[in-house]
Amino acid sequence: MQIQINTDKNVDGNERAINFYSAELKKELDRFDDKITRIEVHFGDENGEKFGKNDKRCLLEVRLQKKQPIVVTDHAESPEKAFYHAVEKLKKVLNSTFEKMREY
């Protein structure tokens, strides 16, 4: 599973943050590891320099073997909260997707 993390100019994308988010994704999505080929994480601050509530965005794009990509997004007051909420959404979608595949 390849992980790529992207940030806009308003969200800190230092090496420590990238390593942290990569490790969290590997831990949270470990049971799907054999089905996921790539994960792209996009962080952004939709208000830029201005202050706003829930203006930090985390978009997760997951590429599965022989399937269409799955995309989930969340907004929160910090990139960390948006990330964790997006990961929870993603786990629900992946569970649902693989349950449907098992039924066929």
Identify what each model region corresponds to.
Residues 1-104:
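N-terminal, polar/charged subdomain of small-to-medium soluble alpha/beta proteins
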